[in-house]
Design a protein with these regions (language model features):
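Catalytic-core region of carbohydrate-active enzymes that cleave or remodel glycosidic bonds
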Residues: 1, 121-131, 151-258
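Aromatic-lined carbohydrate-recognition surfaces of secreted/lumenal glycan-active proteins
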Residues: 3-9, 68-90, 109-146, 184-195
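Active-site-adjacent "subsite" loops/lids of carbohydrate-active enzymes
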Residues: 9-70
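The substrate-binding groove and active-site-proximal loops of carbohydrate-active enzymes
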Residues: 39-60, 72, 76, 103-114, ...
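Aromatic- and acid-rich polysaccharide-binding/catalytic face
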Residues: 83, 89, 102-108, 143-170
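Aromatic- and carboxylate-lined catalytic core of secreted/periplasmic carbohydrate-active enzymes
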Residues: 201-325
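Beta-strand-rich binding/interaction modules
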Residues: 322-341
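C-terminal beta-strand-rich structural cap/linker in extracellular carbohydrate-active enzymes
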Residues: 347-370
Length: 370
């Protein structure tokens, strides 16, 4: 769940904030009253972070939401419907991007902002509902990693991810490797633009590093205030697909169906293929190794593929009719299938790999026991 409370892209947005806060700047002061302007969902302005009344009211609202989630799950057979809460949305922009508008320096804003994020995160952590907390950061200022570390080490925030809005595999790789260095952090791309045709490759790069990746967004509202943002969706605002929609859908189908192994395997045992160029190669072959297996993968149609070793099996898939040849293992059985929502492997059909050579069907996940 994305908790858009006091800050959305560093703004305080009227549409997300109760009227009694918007209309009472004495109790809930903002940084510079005459800096307010009308935007999507009404007034945009800059609430002063960590003021006692603001934190108290937002904490109460957040706590009520956590209670509602907890009660919902209890009524519905304890199904865990929420895995995490994002605290605010790109709150760092209040300290780093809107300074000219509100007149405060980053050094004046950061301490109170981090304390407030921590306090709100602790509301989630102290609730009866078990889930992680995260903050998403932008990457447009030099010290974003330092500030990400400062946020991640607080008691209330478990993880920090970034919103790079870049379609370079190398850039995504570099940012995730830096985030992995923060002790205890789950490095992840919290947002990246849905307009990028190579989101299939960018996501696979993240997964092959043992990290996470999220696309913003599936579809953008056609609201006239957001016309310039409609490029962000994987789909057009009228729900029609874009030119690259299907290849993203295909990739995320096989990621989803192999989710247990992607989530549990050591990242050194997750081999991603076709990650050498930002667009992916139309025809290419690559050889990679996991702990026990060697895999040679070949494509003639820009396949996006992976091989994951976990426990006593390899899980492999491609978005195209590719081929994998396996070395150093003795194959006992091959099954087509998927992992269900409870993490159980669902076998759908047997498969064969004569001479350890597997002719892969598009978007089919195979589990190979060895």
């Amino acid at each position: 769940i994305l908790w858009f409370g006091s800050y959305m892209c560093g703004y305080s947005v009227e549409g997300y904030i109760p009227e009694y806060i918007v209309n009472d700047p004495v109790t809930y002061p903002d940084l510079k009253p005459d800096a307010a302007f009308d935007g999507w969902l009404g007034k945009h302005y800059y609430l002063k972070p960590n003021t006692p009344a603001l934190v108290e009211r937002e904490s109460k609202a957040l706590g009520k939401m956590m209670e509602a989630i907890y009660n919902y799950d209890n009524i519905h057979n304890q199904k865990h419907t929420v895995i995490g809460i994002q605290i605010e949305n790109e709150p760092d922009m209040l300290a780093t991007r809107h300074n000219e508008a509100h007149g405060y320096t980053p050094e004046q804003i950061w301490p109170d902002l981090i304390i407030m994020l921590d306090k709100l995160g602790q509301v989630v952590k102290s609730s009866p509902y078990d889930c992680y907390t995260r903050v998403n950061q932008t990457t447009t200022y030099p010290e974003y990693l330092t500030k990400s570390t400062a946020i991640a080490i607080t008691e209330g925030i478990d993880y920090v991810g970034v919103d790079p809005y870049e379609n370079s595999i190398q850039a995504i790789d570099g940012k995730l490797r830096q985030l992995r260095k923060i002790e205890g952090n789950y490095a992840h791309i919290a947002e990246n633009g849905g307009e990028y045709a190579n989101n299939d490759l960018l996501a696979l790069k993240a997964f092959s590093l043992g990290c996470g990746y999220e696309i913003f967004e599936v579809i953008t509202t056609p609201h006239p205030f957001l016309t310039e943002w409609t490029l962000r969706g994987i789909y057009n605002p009228d729900f029609t697909p874009k030119a690259h929609t299907q290849q993203i859908v295909d990739a995320f189908k096989i990621f989803k169906e192999a989710w247990v192994d992607l989530a549990n395997a050591n990242y050194l045992d997750i081999a991603g293929f076709n990650l050498k160029s930002n667009d992916g190669m139309e025809q290419t072959s690559e050889s990679k190794n996991t702990t026990h297996a060697g895999i040679k993968w070949s494509t003639k149609s820009r396949g996006v593929a992976f091989a994951i070793e976990y426990n006593d099996h390899l899980t492999v898939a491609s978005t195209k009719s590719d081929e994998m040849v396996f070395r150093n293992i003795q194959i006992k059985s091959i099954e087509k299938g998927h992992y269900d929502i409870d993490g159980n492997w669902v076998s759908e059909e047997k498969a064969e790999a004569p001479d350890n050579r597997l002719a892969m069907e598009p978007c089919i996940v195979y589990r190979i026991k060895f």
